[in-house]
UniProtKB/Swiss-Prot annotation:
Designated name of the protein: Ferredoxin--NADP reductase
Pfam families, A to Z: Pyr_redox_2
Family per record: Belongs to the ferredoxin--NADP reductase type 2 family.
Description of how the protein assembles with itself and partners: Homodimer.
Amino acid sequence: MHNTDVLIIGAGPVGLFAIFQAGMLGMKCHVIDAQEVIGGQCITLYPEKPIYDIPAYPKIAAADLIKQLELQAAPFNPVYHLNQQAVELKKEGEFFEVKTSKDIVIKSKVIVIAAGAGSFGPNKPPLANIEEFENESVFYFINNRSKFTGKNIVIAGGGDSAVDWAISLSEIANKIYLVHRRDKFRAANESLRQLKDIAESGKIELVTGYQLDSLEGNNSELQSVIVRDLQNNTRKLNVNILLPFFGLKQELGNLVNWDLDIKLHHIEVDPVYYQTNISGIYAIGDVAHYSGKLKLILTGFAEAASSLHHAYGKVFDGNALHFEYSTTKYTQ
């Protein structure tokens, strides 16, 4: 059995920043994550995707952000339990005991759930032969941007991922078709402005009012994507690559058995300290929900700070926390 002050479930960007915040307050951390490496979706799904809303970084690749967060947390010697899930929860007096899928038991006074989307996988479009092209011509995630250099690409979707990747890949692709069933995209205003400018240049063609209909090709090599509008009109787009970005399936796994207040795959928390309905268990980042929640990495960072300052009194038996700025408290 391992003993620690704080158990963090999830080693994505918000979980990593929670390690730093706990360390600044003198609390030791163990961390559980289902992936083989730390970083969550930033590493597993889009390591090269540029992120624009991290303070002091006008633009930073997701993998580089994780590297910096890992360095920031490292002085506090977190213990990572990777490639395993949190399975069972028991309360023994003032302590929680969590058992992992590898039968490791971790005992702590506080649990911080920073599980992001939980266990995740892509929502795939219902195309008859799509599996034939997967990993050769059809990709749901991008972890090597350079492989799309000079390609003709269909990007399907209307959210941030579709818009941001269309903008990014327009720098290296030959031609991009951005296909969306509606005529409006759901993305940041600045991203929409950039998309409009690039579309006017001809590097991106907006194919709105259409949905994916079928694929044509041979031996895993895509030759064209057929799209269809509401009037049953079709267009053939001659492309090498299809990138469907229709979001992720979210599953919280065994967390649903922990008597937490869960609604629509999110954990309900109070909007001040982000504590769940179980005292001593907090939820932060994308997995947490409260009125007015913004799903931003930046928001998760703030939630990590507030929740761990509140957790200090639970770890140290009600002792008052004397607030100090990091400049006076910590010298690396």
